[in-house]
Amino acid sequence: MVVEVLRLGHRGDRDKRISTHVALTARALGADKIIFTTEDEHVENSVKKVVESWGGNFEFVVEKHWRKYIREFKKRGIVVHLTMYGANINEIMPEIREISRDKDILVIVGAEKVPKEVYELADYNVSVGNQPHSEVAALAIFLDRLFEGKTLYRDFEDAKIKIVPSKDGKVVIREKQNK
């Protein structure tokens, strides 16, 4: 299963920080790719620097034609839209997990009001709670439930920096630089 996250409606300066956090959360919790619908060099460079230092094969892509992308994706996988107005995550997650054994997943996370068409294109509109909160929180909870907590402490290939969980303080492993 490949998991991609579509960040729909990134609004330049207004969303720089939160969109960066959406991308980093996607990477850290198991997604393989983030797709933005608008270009933002600052966010893209921030994400690429994290991947370079912390490892993994996470991809950052810009796709301006999101409707076409969703329709094409549906040929090989399922589309999950995270929203306050969808099916309860606790009730629908077992079904999504079962289907995802054989199919890829595109998770849609909106930045602004999401067009009605997204609700119609999605195979699943999933609510992560019924109170206003952050799309970063919704994505984190969804990915953690999808992977059943297994991605929280995984090792990333080619990592130059690794954190080792420790109850006694910071344990940081850094790749030695060849001089």
From Swiss-Prot:
What does the entry list as the binding residues for S-adenosyl-L-methionine? L82, G110, A111, E112, K113, V114, V128, G129, N130, Q131, P132, H133, S134, E135
Please give the catalytic activity noted in the UniProt record.
cytidine(56) in tRNA + S-adenosyl-L-methionine = 2'-O-methylcytidine(56) in tRNA + S-adenosyl-L-homocysteine + H(+)
Record carries keyword DNA repair? no
Q: Where in the cell is it found?
A: Cytoplasm
Does Methyltransferase count among this protein's keywords? yes
Q: Which UniProt keywords apply?
A: Cytoplasm, Methyltransferase, S-adenosyl-L-methionine, Transferase, tRNA processing
Q: Which InterPro entries match?
A: Alpha/beta_knot_MTases, tRNA_m1G_MTases_N, tRNA_mtfrase_aTrm56
One Gene Ontology BP term is: tRNA nucleoside ribose methylation
- Quote the Pfam families the UniProt record gives: Trm56
Q: Per its record, what are the GO molecular function terms? A: tRNA (cytidine(56)-2'-O)-methyltransferase activity
- Belongs to which family? Belongs to the aTrm56 family.
Q: Enumerate the PANTHER family for this protein.
A: TRNA (CYTIDINE(56)-2'-O)-METHYLTRANSFERASE
List the HAMAP family hit by this protein, alphabetically.
tRNA_methyltr_aTrm56
What's this chain's function? Specifically catalyzes the AdoMet-dependent 2'-O-ribose methylation of cytidine at position 56 in tRNAs.
Q: Which NCBIfam families match?
A: PRK03958.1
The entry's protein name is tRNA (cytidine(56)-2'-O)-methyltransferase
Species source reads Methanocaldococcus jannaschii (strain ATCC 43067 / DSM 2661 / JAL-1 / JCM 10045 / NBRC 100440) (Methanococcus jannaschii)
